[in-house]
Regions:
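Alpha-helical transmembrane segments of integral membrane proteins
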Residues: 3-4, 51, 55, 59, ...
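Short loop segments and helix-boundary regions at transmembrane helix junctions
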Residues: 17-103
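Short amphipathic alpha-helical coupling elements at transmembrane boundaries
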Residues: 68, 72, 111-118, 154-158
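Membrane-embedded alpha-helical core segments of multi-pass
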Residues: 11-12, 19, 62-66, 89-93, ...
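Helix-loop-helix "hairpin" substructures at the membrane interface of multi-pass membrane proteins
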Residues: 121-178
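Membrane-interfacial amphipathic/re-entrant helices at transmembrane-helix boundaries
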Residues: 1-10
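Short juxtamembrane and helix-loop transition motifs at transmembrane-helix boundaries
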Residues: 13-22, 40-51, 147-158, 172-178
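Transmembrane helix-bundle core of multi-pass membrane transporters
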Residues: 82, 86-140
Length: 178
C-alpha cells in the first residue's frame, strides 16, 4: 500500500491541480465510472475477470478522447457532453455486467470496481509502476506547456504551444491516472 501511495501521490498532486484549474473534475469522475464498461467488455472478450486491464485502459482512453474530440467540434458545454457520454457508458456497462454476471461470479469483479489501496496485489503494483513510469516520461517534456495551457491557453497559443495536442495528452494522462 505504501509503494502505491508513494508512486501515485506526487503524480496525483501535480495533475490534480491542472484538473481543477481546467474544471475537469466531472471528467475524471466520468472516466472512473466508465471503467465499469471497460471491465465488462474485457470479461466478454475473454480477459481474466480478476484483471481485465487491457480493455479497461483502452475503453477509458477512447472514452476520454471521444469526449474531448466532440467538445472541440461542438458548442456544447463540457459538462453536458460528459453527462451524456457518462449516461451512455453506465447504461452500456450495467447491461453488459448483467450479461457477464451469468458467466462469472459478479462478486469477483467487485475488487476491480471498488478497489482499495489496502488490498492491492502484485499485478496492481506492476501496472501502477509501469503507468507511473510512462506518465513520468510523458510529463517531463510537456509539463511546462501543460501548465501554461492549463492556466492561460491564449498565452500558450501566442507562445507557439500546440494547445490541442497538449489537451489530448492531458486527457490521456488523466484517464490513465483515474
Amino acid at each position: 500500500a505504501m509503494i502505491c501511495a508513494l508512486l501515485i501521490g506526487p503524480i496525483l498532486g501535480g495533475i490534480g491541480t491542472m484538473v481543477v484549474t481546467k474544471k475537469m473534475a466531472f471528467f475524471s469522475e466520468a472516466v472512473g465510472h466508465a471503467a465499469m464498461t471497460g471491465i465488462a467488455v474485457g470479461v466478454l472478450l475473454g480477459e481474466p475477470f480478476s484483471a481485465p486491464y487491457i480493455s479497461l485502459f483502452t475503453y477509458c482512453i477512447l472514452f476520454g478522447l471521444i469526449i474531448n474530440y466532440t467538445k472541440n467540434r461542438t458548442k456544447m458545454s463540457s459538462d453536458t457532453l460528459i453527462g451524456v457520454f457518462l449516461s451512455i457508458s453506465i447504461a452500456l456497462g450495467g447491461s453488459l455486467l448483467i450479461y457477464v454476471s451469468a458467466k462469472v461470479n459478479s462478486h469477483a469483479l467487485e475488487s476491480i470496481l471498488f478497489g482499495s489501496i489496502l488490498t492491492v496485489n502484485d499485478t496492481d503494483i506492476y501496472i501502477l509502476v509501469v503507468s507511473a513510469i510512462i506518465i513520468g516520461f510523458v510529463l517531463v517534456p510537456y509539463l511546462n506547456r501543460m501548465l501554461l495551457a492549463s492556466f492561460n491557453p491564449n498565452l500558450a497559443i501566442v507562445r507557439g504551444v500546440n494547445v490541442k495536442l497538449i489537451e489530448y495528452i492531458f486527457i490521456i494522462i488523466v484517464t490513465v491516472i483515474t
